[in-house]
């Protein structure tokens, strides 16, 4: 029994350990496990199911009824009597324009839910990429601060040795010690940030990850955008999902005006029924006959609203105001998309420049450190200069790492704004990763 329990624990542990180690695998896991996406999917399915409910108003409505009664009186001719009956009724709408408008509105609302689901899929692509590269960035940061700490440790030991033989002052030892202590604090912070960054991935899939594929920096090369910002804006006008949601919302608001106006229109319904009632007379003083009464009727019902206290006119005005609000919301969304698009385009362009600049910065920092160390050896540079040069090198490497990830994410964000973001974009990014 104990072995079975331990085996169950092992199986449970394995089921929560993720085998996927790259961006694409984690995204595909998240597709089936991310609560935010699953919620949007369920809402979409419910919206499409509601179409069946709305369309049912245009189909026949059939009802079955039954009753039983017992009567006791103090009349001389009838003391007691019992009856039982059953009926079936049918009604069919012949003309109710509101039913057809409701069907159209419900279909548009289902389309809205479908667009919203697609929007959440794009959001999941971005959230997965952000969480993934947040981990890689935290790993790089930890690597660089550890390397900086190790370099400062060697400098501290060297400075201590130089002090011991009288080649430097005690202040240099204190400077080196302070720099090393600060680097140690940076390592502690970086380790904690890395641990916390993994939680972003677990939030998406519910699984834990130990190792991830890393960016292949040897093959990484930020390419300039092939199209101008106006071309990207045209794509956004046609494909931005938030913009499409607002367009559908405006169409629905317009139909709501027509729906409100149907309150003034006539309705025509077909009605039909079949019924049968059996009556049993008991203890009667008169000659009442027991028997069954059958009935059948077919009719057409016409209804024309004449006055409802102004309620219908009020509903029409409300719908008209809501249409104005929907129109303004569409315009607001368009302006927001336009601003986001141009900002996003500029961000990608700037990110390319940043990567190139930080690459040169690393080269320059390496040369500066070499020159500063040589100057320190001959006494033309101080220990402070050497410590600063060391920090500058690893800071430049850290900034270059962040710039690379920023470029990737800014490209994905631009594609989302344009409405073109899809799984293939993650496939392309994933192809630039290598085993960590």
Q: What is each stretch, according to the model?
A:
Residues 1-19:
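Gram-negative bacterial Sec-dependent N-terminal signal peptides
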Residues 24-32, 173, 207-281, 424-436:
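Amphipathic alpha-helical coiled-coil scaffold segments and their short linker/junction regions
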Residues 25, 83-85, 130, 175, ...:
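Transmembrane beta-barrel architecture of outer-membrane proteins
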Residues 28-38, 45-60, 88-105, 115-122, ...:
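A glycine-/polar-enriched beta->alpha junction
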Residues 39-54, 120, 124-144, 154, ...:
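Amphipathic alpha-helical coiled-coil segments
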Residues 65-94, 102, 215-226, 258, ...:
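Small/polar, glycine/serine/threonine/aspartate-rich low-complexity segments that form flexible
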Residues 123-237, 344-347, 351, 392-393:
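Periplasmic alpha-helical coiled-coil/stalk elements that build and connect Gram-negative outer-membrane
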Residues 406-436:
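Gram-negative outer-membrane assembly/targeting C-terminal domains
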């Amino acid at each position: 029994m104990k072995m079975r329990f331990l085996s169950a624990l092992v199986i449970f542990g394995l089921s929560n350990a993720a085998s996927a180690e790259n961006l694409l695998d984690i995204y595909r896991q998240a597709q089936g496990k991310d609560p935010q996406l699953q919620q949007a999917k369920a809402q979409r399915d419910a919206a499409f199911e509601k179409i069946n409910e709305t369309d049912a108003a245009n189909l026949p409505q059939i009802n079955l009824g039954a009753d039983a009664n017992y009567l006791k009186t103090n009349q001389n001719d009838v003391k007691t009597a019992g009856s039982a009956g059953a009926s079936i009724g049918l009604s069919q709408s012949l003309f109710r324009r509101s039913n057809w408008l409701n069907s159209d509105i419900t279909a548009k609302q289902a389309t809205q839910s479908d667009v919203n689901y697609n929007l959440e899929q794009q959001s999941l692509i971005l959230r997965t990429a952000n969480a993934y590269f947040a981990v890689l960035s935290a790993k790089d940061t930890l690597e660089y601060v550890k390397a900086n700490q190790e370099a400062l440790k060697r400098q501290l030991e060297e400075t201590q040795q130089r002090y011991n033989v009288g080649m430097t002052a005690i202040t240099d030892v204190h400077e080196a010690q302070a720099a090393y202590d600060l680097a140690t604090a940076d390592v502690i912070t970086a380790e904690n940030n890395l641990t916390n960054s993994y939680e972003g991935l677990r939030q998406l899939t519910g699984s834990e990850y130990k190792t991830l594929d890393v960016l292949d920096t040897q093959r990484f090369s930020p390419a300039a955008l092939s199209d101008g910002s106006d071309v990207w804006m045209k794509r956004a006008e046609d494909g931005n999902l938030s913009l499409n949601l607002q367009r559908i919302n405006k169409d629905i608001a317009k139909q709501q005006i027509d729906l409100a106006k149907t309150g003034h229109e006539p309705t025509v319904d077909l009605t039909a029924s079949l019924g049968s009632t059996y009556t049993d007379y008991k203890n009667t003083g008169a000659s009442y006959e027991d028997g069954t009464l059958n009935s059948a009727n077919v009719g057409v019902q016409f209804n024309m609203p004449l006055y409802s206290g102004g309620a219908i006119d009020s509903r029409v005005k409300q719908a008209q105001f809501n249409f104005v609000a929907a129109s303004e919301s569409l315009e607001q969304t368009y302006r927001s998309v336009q601003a986001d698009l141009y900002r996003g385009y500029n961000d990608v362009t700037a990110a390319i420049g940043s990567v190139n600049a930080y690459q040169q910065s690393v080269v320059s920092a390496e040369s500066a450190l070499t020159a500063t160390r040589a100057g320190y050896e001959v006494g033309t540079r101080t220990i402070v200069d050497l410590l600063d040069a060391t920090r500058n090198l690893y800071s430049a490497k850290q900034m270059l790492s962040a710039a690379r990830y920023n470029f990737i994410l800014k490209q994905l964000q631009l594609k989302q704004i344009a409405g073109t973001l899809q799984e293939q974009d993650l496939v392309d990014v994933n192809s630039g990763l290598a085993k960590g």
